[in-house]
Amino acid sequence: MCRSHTTMKRVFKKPDSMTDIPFPYCPGCSHGTIHRLVAEVMDELDITKMAVGITSAGCSVRNWRQFDCDMVMALHGRGPAVATGLKRVHPEAIVFTYQGDGDLAAIGTGEIVHAASRCECITVIYVNNGVFGATGGQQAPTTLIGQKTTSYPGGRDPNFSGYPLRIAELLSLVSPRSYIARRSVHDVKHIMATKKAIQESFQMQIDGRGFGLVEVLGACPTQWKLDPVRSMERIVEEVIPYYPLGTFSSPQKEG
C-alpha cells in the first residue's frame, strides 16, 4: 500500500543575506542570534546588494564570513570612522558597523562619540556582553560592579576602575536627533523587539535622517562561567537593572 506524500512548505530558513559558513561562536553566545537579526532586516528591507558592513576587533571579527554583502575590516575601535569615510564617498551605500563593547566602548570611544554627535548617516550594531570575550575574559568598560574577570579576580571596584559605561545614554545626550536604543536577546519577546529596533536604525539611514545605534545586551557564557540558560537569567537579574532597556533618542520624539 502506497502512502500519499504531502508537500511540505518551508516556513523557516536561513536569511538570504547570510552565507552557509557555520558560526564560530561558543554555545549560548548571543552573536549568532544578533547576526541573524541583522541579516533578516537586510532581506526584508532589500538592501543587501547596497550594504557594506564594517568588521571590528573582538569575537565577531570574522563576521565578514557570515554576512553575504560587501565587508570592510577596520582597526580596533575605528569602525565608525571607517564607516563615516565610506558613507561620505558612497552616499548610496547602506553602511553599518558591528562592534562589541571591548571595541566600541574602550579603544573606540572617541570614534563613536564624534560619529554620533555629527549624526553621521550610518548604522551601528553594538553588542554589550560586559567582558572581553575573545582575549580571555578581561574586564571591559561595561563590566558590572563586583563582576569577577581574569584581570580583576576580586571583582570590579569603582574606586579603582570607575563605573560601567552606559553608552546608549551617553550618546543620546550628544546626539538627540539620532535613533539610539538598547535591547536584549534573552528571550523570544525581546529578540523580536531587538529586530524591530535594528530595522528602525537601518530605516534612519535609508531615509537620510542620520545616525542609528542599537545596543544589544548579549551573553558570554564562556567568560561568565555560566551555562547558556543561566546566562540568559543573569541578563534579566543583573544586567538589565544597570543597563535598562528602552529608546533613549529618536527623531519622532522631537517637538
Predicted regions and their residues:
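Flexible, low-complexity linker and terminal segments
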Residues: 2-11, 15, 20-21, 205-255
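Glycine-rich beta-alpha junction loops
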Residues: 57-59, 129-131, 187, 215-223
